[in-house]
């Protein structure tokens, strides 16, 4: 697909968190008319999965298009297993949360890890 409307001729791999739920739609930043709001488009899905590994594997098997954060597909994009389509239609950024015990003095190694991860994720913004 080269344009948003081209997606209608393709199928996606559906992703749903629970059995029987509707799959998530394709999400993109709608810049038509300068709106700059996120919009959704439901694509036909022949298969729906409920975990990230199955989602990627279904795409690799040719069962449809998937929408994942670049960091999740980095290796497949680099080795050519995945081909990025419609890169201008970015989905909303996904937050990453780090949970740690509430302590007055945070261990240095925890702080170093948090700083490293934060810097690493800046690459994917």
Feature annotation, model-predicted:
Residues 1-93, 123-125:
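C-terminal regulatory
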Residues 85-125:
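A late-sequence structural motif
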């Amino acid at each position: 697909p080269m344009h948003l409307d081209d997606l209608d001729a393709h199928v996606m791999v559906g992703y749903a968190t629970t059995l029987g739920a509707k799959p998530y739609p394709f999400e993109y930043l709608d810049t038509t008319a300068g709106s700059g709001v996120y919009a959704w488009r439901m694509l036909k899905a022949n298969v729906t999965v409920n975990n990230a590994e199955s989602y990627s594997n279904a795409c690799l098997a040719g069962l449809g298009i998937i929408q994942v954060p670049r960091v999740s597909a980095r290796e497949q994009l680099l080795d050519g297993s995945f081909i990025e389509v419609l890169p201008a239609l970015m989905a909303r950024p996904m937050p990453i949360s780090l949970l740690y015990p509430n302590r007055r003095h945070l261990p240095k190694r925890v702080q170093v890890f948090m700083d490293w991860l934060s810097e690493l994720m800046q690459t994917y913004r």
